[in-house]
């Protein structure tokens, strides 16, 4: 048994080759009245299926794509259709072979001399081919096509060019490209959004970003899941041929991955501008397939509102009818399901960005940097650098032993090399002012001995460094032990253009002083979020039980 491979990353119907079978040309059967008879002439298989000696092919069908042709079923009722003997070992268990419908020759896929279908829910789950149905599939079993391929197959030139040599290559686990199929509508009655005056079809483009160095705090990659999909599109440019109120763009699960922070922001914590989707174009999706509206800070530039349809929420038939041949292929982690879709409301009066000029300038800048680095390159081998935890705050104390949670440094230059950005010293001006005020109230003439004065001048200062992930309570306790502490930036303000140093220090001071209040507020926000989720869950459980439109079962 050989498994199917992907044809250049294009989404094709899942298929299996089973075994070789010989058929007599005179074998026919009468077509009876049936409730499922699809038109499969346009179903094209990878080239390996036509070149193999295994003639029986099984293919999973989708009811929303391969619909029942009622007129053909009524017309061909009573006609003689070609048939073949189904091997007993083809399906395990008891299979209702009397419900298998052999199809007329004109409705069979190209390259088949006989074949038929099991309708939706006809095959038991234990008898359905394991490789053609997901383990978590719910509802009735999908329809299944079982056909007998011809000994000598001659495909037309269009199918040959479409297949190419993609079927001869083994399948890989890398990201695949989802490509939409062209629809057969004429421009006059076409449903494609490219021909509409109310919508525009955009291309989601990401500017190339320079590679970032490895972080000393590597984050665990988020597992691939499609129960929720909320990408960050703030740095994504939408390329459109014409400006319209609404624009539609295919997204990529590789270039636009799911961001958990965006998902938390959409759960009622931030305001998400919404708009009404036209019902004549977009289907009514409820529950887990509903469109997710994004907050303003995660939208592309120039958009007032936007929503995301997660992967597999829209049917392939919708993409065929409304996107068609104008869809730009995007790399996907899973090409067996439909890609995610962005629908955005464009801001009126926004000036379009000359994206091509911006891309050209970005490429020229990167080329000049690479050329300069090549000129300055030396033959000396670089020593491997072990990523270390960056410093955060250097503290000047009079005690040789560093505070709890800190470590010693020799100089401010070492602190700067470590990555310290804040310098904390004991504020001497306040003590001098208090002493002067006390002497004015109670004048005492005391002569300072030269030895004591020399000891005060020669008093040594010790430097202690706190890491960026040090305990904030330990940092605050060390500053409290100093008495009156003064915070300053270690670097000069001239070296930080565009940074409000005073405001940054003031915000750090507020965090250190009000850390308890910040923690209580964050805890209260989490408790409020838990309460909202529990309330919504209880409201959902109180809803009346209805029949699911996807699987036909009661939920």
Swiss-Prot record:
What UniProt keywords apply to this chain's record, in alphabetical order? Repeat
What InterPro entries would the database entry show? DM7 (IPR006610)
List the residue ranges of the region (Disordered): 430-458
Q: Where is the composition biased (Basic and acidic residues)?
A: 430-441
Q: Which domain of life is it from?
A: Eukaryota
Similarity comment: Belongs to the DM7 family.
**This chain belongs to which protein, by name?**
DM7 family protein GE17493
């Amino acid at each position: 048994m050989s498994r199917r491979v992907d044809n250049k990353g294009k989404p094709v119907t899942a298929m299996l080759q089973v075994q070789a079978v010989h058929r007599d040309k005179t074998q026919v059967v009468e077509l009876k009245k049936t409730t499922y008879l699809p038109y499969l002439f346009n179903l094209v298989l990878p080239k390996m299926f036509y070149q193999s000696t295994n003639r029986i092919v099984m293919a999973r069908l989708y009811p929303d794509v391969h619909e029942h042709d009622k007129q053909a079923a009524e017309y061909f009722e009573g006609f003689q259709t070609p048939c073949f003997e189904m091997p007993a070992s083809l399906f395990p268990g008891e299979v209702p072979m009397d419900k298998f419908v052999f199809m007329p020759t004109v409705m069979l896929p190209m390259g088949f001399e006989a074949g038929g279908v099991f309708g939706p829910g006809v095959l038991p789950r234990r008898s359905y081919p394991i490789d053609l149905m997901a383990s978590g599939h719910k509802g009735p079993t999908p329809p299944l096509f079982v056909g007998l391929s011809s000994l000598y197959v001659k495909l037309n030139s269009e199918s040959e060019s479409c297949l190419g040599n993609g079927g001869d290559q083994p399948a890989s686990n890398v990201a695949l490209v989802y490509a939409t199929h062209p629809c057969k509508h004429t421009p006059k009655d076409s449903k494609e959004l490219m021909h509409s005056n109310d919508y525009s079809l955009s291309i989601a483009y990401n500017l190339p970003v320079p590679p970032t160095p490895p972080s000393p705090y590597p984050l665990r990659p988020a597992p691939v899941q499609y129960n929720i999909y909320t990408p960050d599109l703030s740095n994504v440019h939408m390329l459109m041929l014409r400006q319209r109120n609404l624009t539609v763009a295919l997204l990529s699960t590789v270039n636009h991955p799911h961001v958990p922070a965006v998902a938390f922001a959409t759960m009622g914590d931030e305001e998400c501008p919404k708009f009404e989707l036209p019902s004549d174009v977009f289907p009514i999706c409820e529950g887990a397939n509903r469109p997710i509206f994004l907050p303003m800070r995660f939208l592309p530039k120039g958009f007032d509102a936007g929503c995301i349809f997660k992967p597999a929420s829209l049917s392939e038939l919708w993409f065929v009818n409304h996107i068609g041949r104008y869809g730009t292929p995007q790399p996907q982690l899973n090409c067996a399901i439909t890609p995610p879709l962005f629908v955005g409301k464009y801001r009126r009066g926004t000036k379009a960005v000359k994206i091509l000029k911006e891309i050209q300038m970005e490429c020229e800048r990167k080329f000049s940097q690479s050329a300069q680095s090549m000129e300055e390159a030396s033959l000396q081998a670089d020593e491997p650098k072990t990523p270390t935890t960056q410093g955060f705050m250097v503290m000047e104390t009079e005690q040789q032993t560093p505070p709890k949670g800190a470590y010693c440094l020799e100089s401010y230059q070492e602190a700067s090399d470590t990555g310290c950005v804040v310098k904390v010293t004991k504020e001497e001006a306040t003590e001098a002012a208090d002493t002067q005020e006390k002497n004015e109230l109670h004048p005492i003439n005391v002569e300072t001995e030269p030895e004591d004065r020399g000891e005060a001048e020669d008093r040594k200062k010790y430097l202690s460094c706190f890491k960026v992930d040090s305990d904030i309570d330990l940092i605050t306790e060390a500053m409290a032990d100093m008495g009156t502490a003064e915070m300053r930036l270690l670097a000069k303000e001239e070296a930080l253009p565009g940074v409000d140093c005073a405001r940054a220090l003031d915000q750090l001071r507020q965090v250190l002083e009000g850390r308890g209040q910040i923690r209580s507020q964050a805890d209260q926000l989490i408790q409020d979020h838990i309460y909202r989720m529990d309330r919504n869950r209880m409201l959902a459980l109180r809803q009346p039980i209805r029949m699911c439109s996807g699987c036909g079962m009661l939920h």
